[in-house]
C-alpha cells in the first residue's frame, strides 16, 4: 500500500491536485509540440496553419470537428501511439473514419508519396463509388499517374455456407428447404449474375473516364472483397486507394 503519510486525506487531496496540474500542463505541452512540427511543415509549403486543441475523447473531438462544416477533408494516420506489431488500423482511425461526414485521407506509409504508383478506385455502382471514381481520375490527371478501377465479389461464400448447412440438415429438412435447388440457383444465377453486374459497373466507369479524356484500367476481382482488393493493391504497388464509404 501507500506510505502512511500519503494515506492522510489532506495529503491525498494535495497529491491529486499536483498530479492533475502536471498532467494537464504536460498534455498541453505535448499538443503544442505536435502543432509546432505541423506548423513548420506548413510554413515550408507556404500553407496557412490553424491550431485546434480541444479537450475530450480524441476520436470524438476529431469527429466533432469534421461535423462543424469548416472543413472539406480530414487527414490522419492509420496507426497511432498504441500500435503493436501486426496492427493494421488503430482504434482512433477506425472510429473516426466510420463517423466522419467528410472525405478522409488515411495515411499508411508516411514515406511514400501519392502518385508513386497507380491509384486504385473501388467500384460497386453506388453514387459514392462514382464520386470516388471522379476523385481518383482528377488526382490521376493532376499527378500524371495510372488509375485502375476494381470491383470485387465473393462467389465462394455460398459453397462454404451450403456445405456447413448440409452437415446439419436432415433429409426431410433438406426437402422442405429445397436444398439442392437452392444450391443450383446460387451457382447458375446468383454467382454469374453478380459477376455480370459488377463487370457492367466497371465498363460504365471506363466509359465515364473516357468521356473525361482519361484512361482507366478495369479488373473484376473474386474472393473475400477486402482481401481481393488488398491483394490487388499489393500486386500493382498502388500508392492510393479511393473508395466510397
Give, region by region, the residue ranges found by the protein language model.
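Conserved sugar-transfer catalytic core signal across GT-A, GT-B, and GT-C glycosyltransferases
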Residues: 91-93, 132
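Short, structured coil segments at secondary-structure junctions
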Residues: 92, 100-101
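Glycine/threonine-rich flexible loop motifs
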Residues: 84-88
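Short secondary-structure boundary segments
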Residues: 78-79, 151, 244-245
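Short beta-strand elements of ligand-binding domains
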Residues: 75-78, 104-109
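Glycine-centered tight-turn and secondary-structure capping sites
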Residues: 89-90, 244
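Small/aliphatic-rich secondary-structure junction motif
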Residues: 1-18, 43-50, 117-184, 207-217, ...
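Structural beta-alpha unit
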Residues: 1-74, 187-241
Amino acid at each position: 500500500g501507500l506510505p502512511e503519510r500519503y494515506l492522510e486525506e489532506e495529503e491525498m487531496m494535495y497529491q491529486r491536485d499536483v498530479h492533475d496540474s502536471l498532467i494537464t500542463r504536460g498534455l498541453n505541452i505535448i499538443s503544442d509540440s505536435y502543432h509546432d512540427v505541423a506548423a513548420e511543415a506548413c510554413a515550408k509549403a507556404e500553407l496557412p496553419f490553424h491550431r485546434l486543441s480541444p479537450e475530450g475523447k480524441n476520436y470524438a473531438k476529431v469527429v466533432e470537428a469534421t461535423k462543424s462544416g469548416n472543413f472539406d477533408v480530414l487527414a490522419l494516420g492509420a496507426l497511432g501511439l498504441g500500435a503493436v506489431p501486426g496492427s493494421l488500423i488503430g482504434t482512433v482511425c477506425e472510429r473516426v473514419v466510420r463517423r466522419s461526414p467528410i472525405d478522409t485521407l488515411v495515411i499508411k506509409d508516411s514515406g511514400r508519396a501519392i502518385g508513386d504508383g497507380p491509384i486504385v478506385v473501388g467500384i460497386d455502382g453506388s453514387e459514392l463509388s462514382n464520386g470516388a471514381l471522379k476523385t481518383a481520375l482528377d488526382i490521376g490527371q493532376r499527378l500524371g499517374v495510372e488509375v485502375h478501377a476494381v470491383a470485387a465479389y465473393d462467389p465462394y461464400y455460398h459453397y462454404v455456407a451450403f456445405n456447413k448447412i448440409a452437415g446439419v440438415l436432415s433429409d426431410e429438412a433438406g426437402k422442405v428447404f429445397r436444398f439442392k435447388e437452392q444450391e443450383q440457383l446460387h451457382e447458375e444465377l446468383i454467382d454469374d449474375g453478380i459477376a455480370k453486374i459488377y463487370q457492367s459497373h466497371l465498363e460504365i466507369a471506363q466509359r465515364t473516364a473516357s468521356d473525361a479524356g482519361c484512361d482507366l484500367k478495369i479488373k473484376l476481382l473474386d474472393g473475400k472483397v477486402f482481401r481481393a482488393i488488398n491483394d490487388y493493391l499489393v500486386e500493382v504497388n498502388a500508392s492510393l486507394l479511393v473508395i466510397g464509404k
